[in-house]
Amino acid sequence: MKIVTINDSVSLKRDLDTGTDMQQNAVHSIIAQVREQGDQALFTLTKQFDGADLTTLRVQQAEIEAAYREMEEPVLQAIGEAIENIRDFHERQKRNSWMTTKSDGTILGQKITPLDSVGLYVPGGKAAYPSSIMMNVIPAQVAGVQNIVIVSPPQKDGSIPAGVLVTAAELGVKTILKVGGAQAIAALAYGTESVPAVDKITGPGNIYVALAKRAVFGHVDIDMIAGPSEIVVLADERANPRYIAADLLSQAEHDERASAILVTPSRALAEEVAVEVDQQLTTLPKREIAAASIRDYGAIYVTETLEEAVSVVNELAPEHLEILAEEPMSFLGKIRHAGAIFLGPYSSEPVGDYFAGPNHVLPTNGTARFSSPLNVDDFVKKSSIISYSKAALLENGAKISALARLEGLEAHARAIDIRLEDER
């Protein structure tokens, strides 16, 4: 793992993967096919891309029951407890509608309304993460969304992984559909005979899913276009190098393009961590993926001081930030840009991925400078409420008309003037 002495500013930001022309054209063609042919396109494309010859898209109750039989009790219990923790955290994010009445009788306020429907994309195969179902479904449920649809590509035998089905069932999601890729996004956006159109699409996916989400955005809402996973560890000389190496590798195994970075003022710690990473890599099942990530996107930045290390962290604006230093809570006020902040030696990043409660759908590619983790607010709309009294209009009408005429909008001004004239 390369060790770099910090001289200039650093950045995790990369060019967003907007796909090749061929990929973009393929996605637009798939979307058009789904809009024109509906379910028939989904069956055709699922056979073409996933090798599954389906006669129905909807997961049946018998399949869910079979999935439960595959699950060991300790895993089922862990899923249940994780759901509890995540729900409890997101319940604290709920907002209420409000109204206020001014002295002149004017009533102003904000009305909170949940979205009618949401579609969650769950990747298939080895990337079929039940934890992502919890993190996307629970804030939507807490927000009050009534209709939640899960789509996921089937395996060649037409099945969906047991972990996905059981987690969805534990959350009470009734509509689970066997369709993936750009065609699933198109179906959620525009609807087919079997797939209900939704108002918002969330969830991770490959480049074709990302391009499809970008293409349908505006017709429906989406969560974000997420990049590869990132972790930055801020550590002082007292930190445990074995813990740091393990946590860096926990993100590196996700993807060859994942970023794993240590920032520290301690050259000795940097060298120990580099050795530990090499040693721990040798026993990882996904060592080839992790090794490529560490080689191409991993680094250890050595700074002069801990204060300089904090500045580097804010420049990086990482998805995940671990603080392994004495009195980690004291750093919290200094961190301005990070998707999730893990404090202390026992707050390893997987604690947040699976169990603690905060959402693991986080901003990447430096976008933590201006965006937030997925949360309950992402599944509601806010409507402004205005009830102007006669007294308020008489007092302020001339000012409103003046502002309208300043902008050259005479009809706006007259809409006010006509009411003022009636009251004279």
From Swiss-Prot:
Organism: Halalkalibacterium halodurans (strain ATCC BAA-125 / DSM 18197 / FERM 7344 / JCM 9153 / C-125)
PROSITE patterns named in the record: HISOL_DEHYDROGENASE (PS00611)
Note on cofactor: Binds 1 zinc ion per subunit.
Binding site residues for substrate: 229, 251, 254, 320, 353, 407, 412
Record bears the keyword tRNA-binding: no
Pathway: Amino-acid biosynthesis; L-histidine biosynthesis; L-histidine from 5-phospho-alpha-D-ribose 1-diphosphate: step 9/9
UniProt xrefs under HAMAP family: HisD (MF_01024)
Keyword flag Heme: no
One GO BP: L-histidine biosynthetic process
A cellular component annotation (GO) from this entry: cytosol
Active site (UniProt): 319-320
Protein name in UniProt: Histidinol dehydrogenase
Catalytic activity: L-histidinol + 2 NAD(+) + H2O = L-histidine + 2 NADH + 3 H(+)
Highest classification ranks of the organism: Bacteria, Bacillati, Bacillota, Bacilli, Bacillales
EC number: 1.1.1.23
Cofactor(s), by name: Zn(2+)
The organism's place on the tree of life at top rank: Bacteria
Enzyme class: oxidoreductase
Keywords for this protein: Amino-acid biosynthesis, Histidine biosynthesis, Metal-binding, NAD, Oxidoreductase, Zinc
Chain sites annotated for binding NAD(+): 121, 183, 206
Similarity annotation: Belongs to the histidinol dehydrogenase family.
Pfam families reported for this sequence: Histidinol_dh
Amino acids binding Zn(2+): 251, 254, 353, 412
GO MF entries: histidinol dehydrogenase activity; NAD binding; zinc ion binding
